[in-house]
């Protein structure tokens, strides 16, 4: 069983969001909260645009008040998975568009109340790299978690349109994920526990944010029996049931980056034919320049994937075969010749099987790939809007390739 965490910062009482009755706030208390919040924002290393956007979100949030089921108008479904369904909804009293995650749980009232209480720590998670939180409440057998709506969706959805995500774009993704993980760890002593493409959200302003991190131990425990996955982003040490730490999140990030770069979940690794279909030319394997193996391999678990002009007809890897592969076989890697050596080395450092030898957050933040990516002007918003055919609200910089 996962250990319970306790919030390390005093809760920000911006607004009452537990559906057990609103708590009155005075004008003086609101001003004190804003001063407290201002101090917390000053502690973060934000540029002017990030600070203004975060302040704008928190100003909107302060006007929301108590969240109730009757106040929401469902617009569309955004996605499903991880034990819940996420819908795009309008909060009628405020007029705000939110992402509302509904999790159906057969639980006792005491457990439900504990989950709602534990979720309140999300009010303290104010970062440009963390999806904004409006509140959580319980209604008709469902926990509702109300979040900032990200109009670009998740990176697994973006990947379906893009087919592969360019290295310079993934550089910006890597920076955001590392900074988000560092924020959770340093400011709140929280591990994410579920880093994967579907939990990295993007929007047409070019923001990249983490969502669905393990803030509620009780919710994790309550959902454990209902989770059935076809892919795993868990580290070898976590799959083996041994002690794990933020190093496990780093493995998950590395695996996600390989998937986004090559266009599909990377276990088992693609063979030469599949890589040639994906990249449009023969791809070499490793530093020795040898071609990738042409021997047929099982395809990744889940639905068949498109290869070239047809569907992949290889037998799917069973989930137990996948987990065994992660634990016992060599880790995935990026193919040579199509990515920079810096990017390849960065991913390799994330995917070292021994967590004691795996790179930590500090080392990765100082890696040459990250330093190069920080210095590059990449129009992430423009690339995303072209890929998803979204209207772009921001000013482009350099066109991403």
UniProtKB/Swiss-Prot annotation:
Write down the InterPro entries for this protein, in alphabetical order: Kinase-like_dom_sf, MAP_kinase_kinase, Prot_kinase_dom, Protein_kinase_ATP_BS, Ser/Thr_kinase_AS
Which residues carry the post-translational modification N-acetylmethionine, per the record? 1
What's the main place this protein lives? cytoplasm
Q: Reaction catalysed by this chain?
A: L-seryl-[protein] + ATP = O-phospho-L-seryl-[protein] + ADP + H(+); L-threonyl-[protein] + ATP = O-phospho-L-threonyl-[protein] + ADP + H(+); L-tyrosyl-[protein] + ATP = O-phospho-L-tyrosyl-[protein] + ADP + H(+)
The UniProt keywords, alphabetically, are: Acetylation, ATP-binding, Cytoplasm, Kinase, Magnesium, Membrane, Metal-binding, Nucleotide-binding, Phosphoprotein, Serine/threonine-protein kinase, Transferase, Tyrosine-protein kinase
Q: Name one GO biological process term.
A: epithelial cell proliferation involved in lung morphogenesis
Which residues does this entry mark as bearing Phosphoserine? 23, 222, 226, 293, 295, 306
**What topology does the record note for this protein and the membrane?**
Peripheral membrane protein
Q: Which cofactor(s) are needed, names only?
A: Mg(2+)
**What's noted about post-translational modification?**
Phosphorylation on Ser/Thr by MAP kinase kinase kinases (RAF or MEKK1) positively regulates the kinase activity. Phosphorylated by MAP2K1/MEK1. Low levels of autophosphorylation have been observed.
Stored Pfam families: Pkinase (PF00069)
Q: Quick one: which residues bind ATP?
A: 78-86, 101
Q: How does it assemble?
A: Interacts with MORG1. Interacts with SGK1. Interacts with KSR1. Interacts with KSR1 and BRAF; the interaction with KSR1 mediates KSR1-BRAF dimerization. Interacts with GLS.
The similarity comment for this entry is: Belongs to the protein kinase superfamily. STE Ser/Thr protein kinase family. MAP kinase kinase subfamily.
Q: Per its record, how is this protein called by name?
A: Dual specificity mitogen-activated protein kinase kinase 2
Q: Which gene carries the instructions for this protein?
A: Map2k2
